[in-house]
């Protein structure tokens, strides 16, 4: 499942930890900008594009631009145009996906841990090292988020998703990278029509998992 050629590439391994830090910083700044505005009326990709066509800058547009910038930076060490495009899209789209998941206490974190732990074990050494600090901080934050004493917000959920996308892009081989991109892209498109929270609440086993640890 995991590509030996990608995992063992020393140039990618050395740069990956730096990429994690840069990606988190860029996405965090955009997410914080959106959180601090707190007056957004536009919803979804189409809503933000419509606002832009009307000459109004929204926090969502800033996040879209930041996701593109972070994706472009993350793609720099990728080998070949195809891989660069996959890295770019996975980072940008996964950042947005986790923002969509952050609609209930602990939900985005639970999904993140499903990816982080296997990726830290099987992914490139640089990615594992780069993620370790973030994962440690998130483990400490989880009880606080579950008890609703604090919330991730865009400044938290978006960077988490971006790092998941980065790790997937540099840990999976070609067929699985494309599969991951297809799934993430499809979920982003689906979110324009379907409420993930409604799906979770109407599915017994998802609802049970969603409520684990919550008061």
Region locations from a protein language model:
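"…together with the soluble PPM/PP2C metallo-phosphatase catalytic core" -> "…together
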Residues: 1-194, 198
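Short, highly charged, low-complexity non-transmembrane loops/tails of multi-pass membrane proteins
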Residues: 199-215
């Amino acid at each position: 499942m995991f590509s030996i050629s990608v995992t063992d590439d020393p140039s990618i391994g050395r740069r990956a930890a730096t990429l994690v830090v840069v990606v988190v910083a860029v996405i965090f700044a955009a997410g914080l900008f959106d959180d601090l505005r707190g007056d957004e009326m536009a919803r979804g990709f189409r809503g933000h594009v419509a606002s832009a066509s009307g000459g109004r800058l929204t926090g969502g547009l800033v996040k879209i631009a930041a996701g593109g910038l972070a994706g472009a930076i993350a793609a720099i060490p990728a080998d070949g145009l195809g891989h660069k495009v996959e890295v770019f899209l996975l980072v940008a789209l996964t950042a947005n996906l986790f923002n969509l998941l952050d609609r209930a206490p602990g939900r985005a974190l639970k999904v993140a841990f499903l990816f982080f732990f296997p990726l830290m074990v099987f992914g490139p050494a640089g990615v594992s090292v780069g993620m370790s600090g973030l994962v440690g901080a998130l483990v400490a934050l989880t009880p606080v988020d579950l008890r609703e004493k604090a919330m991730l917000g865009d400044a938290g959920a978006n960077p988490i998703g971006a790092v998941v996308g980065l790790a997937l892009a540099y840990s999976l081989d070609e067929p699985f990278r494309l599969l991951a991109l297809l799934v993430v892209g499809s979920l982003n498109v689906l979110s324009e029509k379907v409420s993930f929270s409604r799906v979770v609440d109407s599915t017994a086993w998802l609802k049970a998992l969603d409520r684990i640890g919550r008061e």
